């Protein structure tokens, strides 16, 4: 019996190793294009802080700037409908690719912490010569968006946080010690990258991953799946995502965007849009955020999960357009009262 158990275990382990190795090989064959060659002609690269960041634009150059920051696995094109909706109102919409996703340059030293990412967002404002903008951050992009607002508060007219993964704890909190098994996994690059190649950057799993974030699986349409898959041909995407994982799963320090006092001190309007059925960042996180920020408004989208702009684009864009309009009015009122 014991001999049989060990044989079965060895066979299963060998099968797992072969699967991981196979998908790693496929990733290496697929991820061969330079970002500049793979990127769509609808955008361009700008130097932002330490990296060349890919951006896409819509709307008049003299419109109210609205800068979009996407979530995990997405890229600037995921905001296309929202950008068009804002451009139709006269706003200037700018969406960026936050590394390691999309087509932006990846940092050689794996600097993916929220503060580094926040500096890149401010760098995009610098690259465009933008004095003040409305910042829109979704999911994992919410933390860097908030970091940008804390780094340069005078550059932010308003915040729009969409199902934001902020990990707000307490002001005296320290970065938690990750479990030993997780530390070992993250530190073992060949294993880490093999798992990433199998599940995260594997086009065969794109639809399943997307469906795991939304309430209605049918909303993961072929068009959306292809959109998410498009950057997966960029050279070294798998090792870049692998290098990003420690910043997501085992950060070494508590970011300013994770401290309640950072929100209590915000002086700009904060518009919070949250899916009622979000299982990734549950609604109570959005409700807590609305209580922390003094100038916050919470809008809850019914029967929507973690990605409102995919699940109910018309409803989301209506809320977004209203939020940006309110931000413009409040900014004008503040300027006239000086």
Predicted stretch roles:
Residues 266, 272-274:
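Short beta-strand/loop motif that positions the catalytic acidic residue
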Residues 294-338:
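Catalytic active-site module of serine/aspartate enzymes centered on a nucleophile-bearing elbow/loop
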Residues 58-103:
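Conserved HGGG/HGGXW glycine-rich cap/lid loop of the alpha/beta-hydrolase fold
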Residues 48-58, 95-140, 175-177, 318:
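Active-site loop/oxyanion-hole signature of alpha/beta-hydrolase fold enzymes
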Residues 277-281:
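Acidic catalytic loop of the alpha/beta-hydrolase fold
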Residues 1-64, 88-91, 130-131, 324-338:
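Alpha/beta-hydrolase fold catalytic core
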Residues 131-175:
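Conserved hydrolase catalytic core segment
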Residues 24-35, 172-174, 197-264:
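Conserved alpha/beta-hydrolase catalytic His-Asp/Glu region
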């Amino acid at each position: 019996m014991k001999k049989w158990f060990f044989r079965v275990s060895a066979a299963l382990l060998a099968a797992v190793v072969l699967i991981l190795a196979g998908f790693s090989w496929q990733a290496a064959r697929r991820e061969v294009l330079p970002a500049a060659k793979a990127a769509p002609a609808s955008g361009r690269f700008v130097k932002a802080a330490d990296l060349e960041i890919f951006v896409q634009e819509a709307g008049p150059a003299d419109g109210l700037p609205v800068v979009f920051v996407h979530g995990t696995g997405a890229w600037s094109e995921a905001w296309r409908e929202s950008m068009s909706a804002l451009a139709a109102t006269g706003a200037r919409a700018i969406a960026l690719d936050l590394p390691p996703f999309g087509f932006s340059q990846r940092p050689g030293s794996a600097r993916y912490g929220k503060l580094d990412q926040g500096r890149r967002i401010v760098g995009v404002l610098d690259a465009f010569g933008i004095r003040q903008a409305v910042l829109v951050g979704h999911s994992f992009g919410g933390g860097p968006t908030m970091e940008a607002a804390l780094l340069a508060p005078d550059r932010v007219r308003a915040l729009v946080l969409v199902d934001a993964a902020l990990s707000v704890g307490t002001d005296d909190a320290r970065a938690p010690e990750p479990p030993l098994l997780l530390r070992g996994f993250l530190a073992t690059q060949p294993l880490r990258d093999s798992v990433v190649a199998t599940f995260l950057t594997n086009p065969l799993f794109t639809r399943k991953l997307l469906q795991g974030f939304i309430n209605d699986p049918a909303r993961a349409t072929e068009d959306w799946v292809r959109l998410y898959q498009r950057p997966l041909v960029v050279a070294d995407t798998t090792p870049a995502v692998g290098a990003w994982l420690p910043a997501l799963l085992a950060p070494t320090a508590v970011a300013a965007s994770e401290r309640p006092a950072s929100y209590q001190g915000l002086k700009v309007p904060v518009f919070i849009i949250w899916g009622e059925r979000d299982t990734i960042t549950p609604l109570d996180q959005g409700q807590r955020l609305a209580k922390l920020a003094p100038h916050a408004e919470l809008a809850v989208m019914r029967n929507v999960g973690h990605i409102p702009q995919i699940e109910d684009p018309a409803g989301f864009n209506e809320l977004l357009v209203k939020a940006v309009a309110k931000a413009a009015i409040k900014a004008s009122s503040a300027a006239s009262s000086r």
